Amino acid sequence: DPEDIPLNRIEAVKELLLDTVGDDERFFAAKLLTSWGIHEGLVALERSMESPESLEGTYSHRLHGYDDTYCQILMAVTRYFANVADRGDTDLARAQVFSPLTKIIELSNSKPFEIGKIFDFVVNEKYLEYLPYIRNHLSLIIDHPDIHRWKIYDAIECLLKLDSKFVMSLLKEKNKTVEDFRPSVAR
């Protein structure tokens, strides 16, 4: 919990964010501050996302080896939202996380990392401003199940809860069903 983090530790990480010359150290400081609900961290993290290639390879997926850096950023941003909302600033947090989360959705259109936490966030909070981005995401990845199978199903599940007409129309257009994308576990 953020209240358990000593103020001197927060200040030390802020100094790293401002004074370090290394991009890696700045990124890790920004991610940590973001997860603690510190706005300076979120701003710096979003700035680092402006050149995605500089972050690629920071984290690898533990099973499949693809770049998982943006999934890690996603976790920090959703924690940011939770921490700021817990302080009573839900509307402020909602506005502040919109840009980084939509950037993550857009990057995920062409990269294999998972964004299921965004779908959970959107469904749980009923933040419909994300729907155009999620619709576009599904439209772009649905023809590439070899890369995005789990993500396709996750996006379908999300949109079935919030915009089922869109999902059914897209599936009909592609001559597919939800079952065509349901993940199965090989035995």
What is the meaning of each model-derived region?
Residues 21-22, 52-55, 108-112, 145:
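Short inter-helical turns and helix N-cap capping residues of alpha-solenoid HEAT/ARM repeat scaffolds
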Residues 147-187:
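Eukaryotic acidic, Ser/Thr-rich intrinsically disordered low-complexity regions
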Residues 18-19, 34-35, 106-109, 123, ...:
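Alpha-solenoid HEAT/Armadillo repeat architecture
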Residues 102-129:
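Ampipathic, surface-exposed secondary-structure segments
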